[in-house]
């Protein structure tokens, strides 16, 4: 929608326009789907009554689309209407470019995401091609490196035209996102409806599997992304060691690196 070059010219007037370095009281004139110029606040057009007018937001990481596919326990919505609903929410929030974050692989919970991945990507590519989205939708592949199935899955989807960002993550408990192993055990028992002893055994198996397969899976994902020139983000960096690991991998984007550099994170 936002790339339309045949859209009629229109003016948004009497607005507080947020630019890169100032807030300007004026009007924005749009022609051929692009901002043509900024004019005086009293030009004829659609009056905003002094409200703020900001550039469209870019959301690099939203898991929101999966919420529409699984709106409640035991319910799965078809990808096409789920994506349409997601698109509406995105635009209502001022986001004009969204990187829909889809899980490639699974730690243990939400294993259904493996089956969801391909149908969602196919539906997204079709909707993009047919111009059914209002926002620009791109793909952010969140690759679970503690799952050996991630290798095959990433090879199947990383060539999709919309893939523009990859992140590597390891949700095995005891490090990064989940430090409290016991809380993970309790969550596993609740979500998978199994006894605590079984949940604890499954958790121990997951931790062991992460140590065994994560280095190889991580390297595979990194190589696949690098071969296509796709940027890679680290995920859930909690310590300087995590940041150093990210920095050692040439093209990794690490948000926490900036925090450490600024003295906002010391461990």
Model regions and ranges:
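Short amphipathic alpha-helices and their capping/turn segments at secondary-structure boundaries
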Residues: 44, 48-51, 83-90, 151-166
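Hydrophobic faces of well-ordered beta-strands that scaffold small-molecule active sites
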Residues: 58-60, 98-100, 137-141, 164-168, ...
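Histidine-rich, glycine-flanked metal-binding segment
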Residues: 2-11, 16-54
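Fold-independent oxyanion-binding glycine-rich loops
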Residues: 14-15, 20, 49, 56, ...
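Active-site-adjacent C-terminal substructures of enzyme catalytic domains
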Residues: 139, 227, 236-267
């Amino acid at each position: 929608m936002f790339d339309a070059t045949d859209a009629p010219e229109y003016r948004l007037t009497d607005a507080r326009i947020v630019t890169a370095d100032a807030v300007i009281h004026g009007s924005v004139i749009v022609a051929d789907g692009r901002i043509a110029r900024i004019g005086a606040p009293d030009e004829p057009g659609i009056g905003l009554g002094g409200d703020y007018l900001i550039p469209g937001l870019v959301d690099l990481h939203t898991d929101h689309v999966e919420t529409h596919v699984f709106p409640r326990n035991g319910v799965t919505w078809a990808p096409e209407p789920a994506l349409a609903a997601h698109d509406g929410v995105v635009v209502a929030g001022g986001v004009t470019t969204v990187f829909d974050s889809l899980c490639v692989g699974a730690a243990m919970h939400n294993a259904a995401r493996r089956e969801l991945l391909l149908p969602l990507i196919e539906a997204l590519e079709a909707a993009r091609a047919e111009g059914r989205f209002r926002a620009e939708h791109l793909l952010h592949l969140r690759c679970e490196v503690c799952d050996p199935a991630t290798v095959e899955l990433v090879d199947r989807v990383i060539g999709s035209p919309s893939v523009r960002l990859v992140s590597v993550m390891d949700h095995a408990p005891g490090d990064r996102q989940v430090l409290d192993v016991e809380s993970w055990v309790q969550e596993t028992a609740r979500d998978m409806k199994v006894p605590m002893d079984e949940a604890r055994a499954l958790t121990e198996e997951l931790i062991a599997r992460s140590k065994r397969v994560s280095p190889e899976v991580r390297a595979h994902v990194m190589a696949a992304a690098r071969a296509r020139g796709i940027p890679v983000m680290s995920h859930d960096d909690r310590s300087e060691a995590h940041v150093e690991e990210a920095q050692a991998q040439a093209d990794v984007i690490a948000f926490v690196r900036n925090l450490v550099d600024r003295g906002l994170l010391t461990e």
